[in-house]
Amino acid sequence: MKRVNVILAGGASRRFGEPKAFAKWKGGMFYEQAKKAFGGGETVIISRPEHIKKFLSNRERHVLADEPRFRGMGPLAGIYTAMKQTEGETFTVISCDTPLVTRKTMVALEMKLTGNLDAVIPVCKNREQPLLAVYHKRVQDVLFDQLTQNKLKMTDTLKRLSVCYVQAEDIGAGPEEFANINTQDDYTRLLAHVESSNQD
């Protein structure tokens, strides 16, 4: 099955104060860390129209804005846009604000999308993580239906799908991999954590 990697980088980043996708991280930017976790293959970045030029100037070739009718409708619109505008059977999704996610974790999730499953969703500390997940192309019509009804919660969408829920600890994924960097305080703590780890 052909896999397409999807980086969700279309959030408003209001609490962060600047586009999170371009936050500095390990000699690069947050979104580039997501690309490393994919480990290669076709990658599409879903972003806001005003940020596309910056991605292109950083030599990214496949950058899309949400479908016009669903613009500004959150990650559901981003995943739908990727499915509609690219040729793939499975879609591995990473939100750009989770820079600690590893390739090992994403491979483990990808391997579990088999048979008639629509999605593989990790669960960490009793919280579903639908923005670090794998989806089959067949869910596109469900996403469209949810968007047209303005039902934008990912958890509501998952109720309509055949989902394999995977406990993070069962695939050796640490809770830090699912931590969202939403504010500058989160970012400062992240940098301090990494600096401390490097000194150990």
UniProtKB/Swiss-Prot annotation:
It is found in: Cytoplasm. Keywords: Cytoplasm, GTP-binding, Magnesium, Metal-binding, Molybdenum cofactor biosynthesis, Nucleotide-binding, Transferase. Coiled coil: none annotated. GO terms for cellular component: cytoplasm. Its cofactor is Mg(2+). One of its GO terms (biological process) is Mo-molybdopterin cofactor biosynthetic process. Its EC number is 2.7.7.77. It catalyses: Mo-molybdopterin + GTP + H(+) = Mo-molybdopterin guanine dinucleotide + diphosphate. Mg(2+) binds at D97. GTP binds at L8, A9, G10, K20, D66, D97. Its main location: cytoplasm. Transmembrane segments: none annotated. It is an enzyme of class 2 (transferase). GO terms for molecular function: GTP binding; metal ion binding; molybdenum cofactor guanylyltransferase activity. It holds the Pfam family NTP_transf_3. It comes from the Bacteria. The keyword tRNA-binding does not apply. Transfers a GMP moiety from GTP to Mo-molybdopterin (Mo-MPT) cofactor (Moco or molybdenum cofactor) to form Mo-molybdopterin guanine dinucleotide (Mo-MGD) cofactor. Belongs to the MobA family. This is Probable molybdenum cofactor guanylyltransferase. The gene is mobA.
